[in-house]
Amino acid sequence: MVSQEPHFELRLASSPEDIRAAQRLRYEVFVAELGADGALVDHEARLEADRFDPFFDHLMLLDHRRAVGEQVVGVYRVMQEQGAKAAGQFYSEDEYDLAPLKSSGRRLLELGRSCVHADYRGGTALIHLWTGLADYIVTHEIEILFGVASLHGTDVAELAAPLSLLHHRHLAPEGLRPKARAAGYQDMNLIAEDALERTAATRALPALIKAYLRLGGAVGQGAFVDHAFNCTDICLILDTALMSEKHRALYARGRGI
């Protein structure tokens, strides 16, 4: 994958050192910045890891202008069905019943742990990652993308507006609608649709979730409150067959960046 900005390199992790570099960035974003924690988080080495990392492909954006060891500025991890079989499950299955997706007969790709270094937000970094993801999707003939996406915090009262908007306007078709598991289940129908301030609710959604919705994405039933990661998760689903022609063309080009 060749970038039009020569200081950037976009590629898949190919060594344990690469994966540790991705985990370092994830630590800075998810742990140091957002307050997450987990059983395999290494605070001394500043690495955010979990048991699923060996089964994912790790898409990394590097800026070669930075010091060695600090060049990874964006990451995305993706897992196909064979990775999930090797791991024993998809990552999202801890929080959602994925039976509707797994029985669909469609080719699935789980997305997760997307993050960009603070100095690169609002620029081209996320665009590079998304274009590289598009290349991966075309190469592997992926039909459905899914994964958990997070709203920061676990105070459901503060998240009532964006969760209600997702429930009323963006539920996935029933045949492709995962349901949050009982252990952390949170009803998203918290504010009646006619009482919802839609502009404010939309503004409260994280940029990544809004981007998926613009592509035609939808959400599963219920949110999952994740206290360990200090967030409230939703399950995003994107059926590439239902994307607009404009956005499908982006994926069909399949030429990376």
What are these regions (language model features)?
Residues 235-257:
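Long, continuous compositionally biased terminal/linker segments
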Residues 49-60, 86, 229-234:
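A short helix-loop-beta-strand connector motif used in the catalytic cores of GNAT acetyltransferases and
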Residues 7, 56, 73-75, 108, ...:
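Extracellular structured ligand-interaction cores
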